[in-house]
């Protein structure tokens, strides 16, 4: 039985554990703040601790940003503080110190692999995983094979334009999905609408008074006030639901998945709202057979399962599916 050191690295949190190819975690899951400016050192420190627990056979990492899986480094990492860190080499220091193979994957593609191997795929041949976090990202796995794209940048689903006439944008993309529906986008959209929608700008609701008093505006605040009956917050979330359906519908028409799983903080904390909105509006935007929609059963550990799915994918340990040479080769 192989023992794999697993790392689920996010922009904010850094999770680690030891797992086996069948999906079992054999050590406690540790969680700490991500230290992007010393990420290599942070990995090495945790690996030292893991080596004292088990004799490790490999290291698998799910990481955000622009990832070069073949070279084993992160090309670009955007920190929560807005810094851009370029070229974080993860493979070389690990191989040099521990002499272990290292398998690295972008967190969105890795999450889709985690769903394929360890989620609720059942008998579906094709799935999409969507993460609604600070932004929106995702991955596609079709018949066991992840879609990475020409330069391994596939999965930037949050940059699909769902409102091309809008003034809002993300990463320079006008009307980008995540500019409205992500953890960062929801409050930005609400603030923009409050400034530009004459119907609501003078409304004396709890929500608009909160904004007028310069109280904190965040996605949780929007959901909290909507649940309390605030008409403006409810109106905003109703429109956001349609934008979500437009994004998911576009993906369905492009990839025809049998299953779409949803994860990330916005989804995990607002499951009923997200699923109800998609079920209500998806037929407006989806021509192909509608997929099964479900919250990911992997929860907050999806990054770790994604790392383990990456290990399975790269080593060809995929039961019942023939793996082509390009997928079964290591990233050495």
Q: Where in the sequence are the language-model features?
A:
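A charged helix-plus-loop insertion that forms the helical arch/lid used to bind
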Residues: 73-84
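ATP-binding/phosphotransfer module of carbohydrate and carboxylate kinases, centering on a glycine-rich
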Residues: 1-59, 69-73, 92, 96-100, ...
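Short beta-strand segments
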Residues: 8, 60-64, 129-135
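Short clusters of small/polar residues that mark proteolytic maturation junctions
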Residues: 29-31, 79, 151
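Glycine-rich phosphate-binding loop of actin/hexokinase-like ATP-binding domains
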Residues: 122-181
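Conserved A3 ("GATE") glycine/threonine-rich loop of ANL adenylate-forming enzymes
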Residues: 12-13, 108-110, 134-137
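General beta-strand structural signal in soluble alpha/beta enzymes
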Residues: 102-106
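A short acidic/small-residue loop/turn micro-motif
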Residues: 33-35, 82, 154-156
């Amino acid at each position: 039985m192989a023992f794999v050191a697993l790392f689920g690295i996010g922009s904010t949190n850094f999770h680690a554990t030891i797992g086996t190819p069948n999906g079992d975690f054999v050590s406690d899951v540790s969680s700490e703040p991500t230290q992007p400016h010393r990420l290599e050192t942070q990995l090495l420190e945790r690996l030292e601790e893991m080596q004292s627990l088990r004799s490790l056979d490999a290291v698998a990492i799910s990481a955000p940003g622009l990832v070069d899986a073949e070279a084993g480094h992160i090309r670009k990492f955007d920190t929560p503080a807005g810094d851009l860190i370029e070229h974080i080499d993860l493979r070389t220091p690990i191989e040099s110190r521990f002499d272990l193979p290292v398998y690295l994957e972008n967190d969105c593609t890795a999450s889709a692999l985690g769903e394929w191997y360890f989620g609720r795929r059942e008998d579906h041949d094709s799935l999409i995983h969507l993460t609604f976090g600070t932004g929106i990202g995702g991955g596609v796995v079709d018949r066991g094979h992840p879609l990475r794209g020409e330069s391994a940048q596939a999965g930037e689903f949050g940059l699909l334009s769902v409102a091309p006439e809008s003034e809002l944008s993300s990463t320079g993309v006008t009307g980008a999905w995540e500019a409205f529906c992500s953890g960062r986008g929801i409050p930005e959209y609400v603030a923009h609408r409050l400034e530009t929608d004459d119907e609501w700008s003078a409304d004396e609701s709890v929500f608009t008074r909160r904004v007028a008093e310069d109280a904190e505006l965040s996605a949780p605040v929007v959901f909290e006030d909507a649940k309390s009956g605030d008409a403006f917050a409810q109106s905003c979330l109703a429109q956001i639901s349609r934008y979500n359906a437009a994004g998911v519908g576009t993906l369905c028409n492009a990839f025809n998945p049998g299953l779409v799983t949803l994860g990330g903080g916005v989804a995990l904390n607002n499951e009923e709202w997200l699923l109800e909105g998609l079920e209500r509006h998806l037929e407006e935007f989806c021509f192909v057979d509608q997929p099964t929609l479900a919250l990911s059963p992997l929860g907050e550990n999806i990054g770790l399962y994604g790392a383990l799915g990456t290990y399975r994918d790269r080593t060809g340990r995929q039961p019942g599916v023939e793996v082509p040479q390009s997928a079964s080769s290591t990233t050495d």
